[in-house]
């Protein structure tokens, strides 16, 4: 019985020796985009709270009100007796905002991708093994979903639709189901995909298009409902989350009525999971209610991100192709990236170093993210501090 434990310890030791050791740090969220981390108050430039909704009074009030009305837990999966009345209300809001036929609320983003994707790729249902064309930098949960299905991925270069089309052409004669999988905003790079271009390829080659809008929901697209909302009815399935721009927790998919019915009967993560608690649903509902009223907030955050990027680029830093509140500062070397993160911490700023295996070798970076909870002065402070800290590291 000791052998597995020895193997686990050896794994941890190898990660630590490689400088890739991860550990938890207790935090306490504070108002105005601040956080107490290891007892130190920092301006938080590492969260996904893009719209500042995680501390919004309406979300907190509705979460408490729905907890009072329906209790602290759903008590069962939705298929058993946990399909509480609020689910239909939230799904109706999603349908209206996304311009789709149907919606289905799920428990979390990782769970959604890792259970919905295998359901879609089921070889027994499709009558054979499908072809999956996946952006190389898709989220780990999407790659995991394909692996669970036991299907081989054809990975195209990140954001390169010409490369994707060459792959689609090469396999055009194969009489099997074809799937294109992509995020719309990439979580570690902050860049956007050409949704219209993906739709054109989907239509040209008869493929099923699956888009992950986790980091676009709340921030981009019509009324903040994501980039795919500008193309109603043209994407087969859109996945998104409530845990980032919407300030809460949970996930959703939008699709056709027929596909929703299929997932209810086939997606294991939906079938076998206890439904989300009423308090979480209350925060979801409030966020969706607020979204159409938040155009000025979205514009401010995007404009602030553009100013910070411009300042960093003017200082000679590489921020990739970011066009969202996610701003990577590409460093490359892991130890220098960690040193930059520590330098910012000494100045009262939280910017987390992102290293392999989260990102490819040689692309370690600081992943910065802006929030509507920040002031313009916070953003100016960040734009000045990053180049200064990096100069000190470089000597």
Swiss-Prot record:
GO biological process terms, alphabetically, are:
biotin biosynthetic process
Q: Does the keyword NADP apply?
A: no
**Pathway linked to the protein:** Cofactor biosynthesis; biotin biosynthesis
Q: What top-level class of enzyme does the UniProt entry assign?
A: transferase
What residues bind substrate, as annotated? 22, 139, 358
> What keywords sit in the KW lines?
Biotin biosynthesis, Pyridoxal phosphate, Transferase
Single GO MF descriptor? pyridoxal phosphate binding
Q: Which reaction does it catalyse?
A: 6-carboxyhexanoyl-[ACP] + L-alanine + H(+) = (8S)-8-amino-7-oxononanoate + holo-[ACP] + CO2
> Which cofactors does this gene product need?
pyridoxal 5'-phosphate
Q: Name one Pfam family in it.
A: Aminotran_1_2
Gene3D superfamilies associated with the record: Aspartate Aminotransferase, domain 1, Type I PLP-dependent aspartate aminotransferase-like (Major domain)
Q: Which family does it belong to?
A: Belongs to the class-II pyridoxal-phosphate-dependent aminotransferase family. BioF subfamily.
NCBIfam families in the record, alphabetically?
bioF (TIGR00858)
Q: What does this protein do?
A: Catalyzes the decarboxylative condensation of pimeloyl-[acyl-carrier protein] and L-alanine to produce 8-amino-7-oxononanoate (AON), [acyl-carrier protein], and carbon dioxide.
Can you state the subunit structure given in the record? Answer: Homodimer.
Protein name (record): Putative 8-amino-7-oxononanoate synthase
- Per the UniProt entry, what species is this protein from, by scientific name? Magnetococcus marinus (strain ATCC BAA-1437 / JCM 17883 / MC-1)
Q: Could you tell me the gene encoding this protein? A: bioF
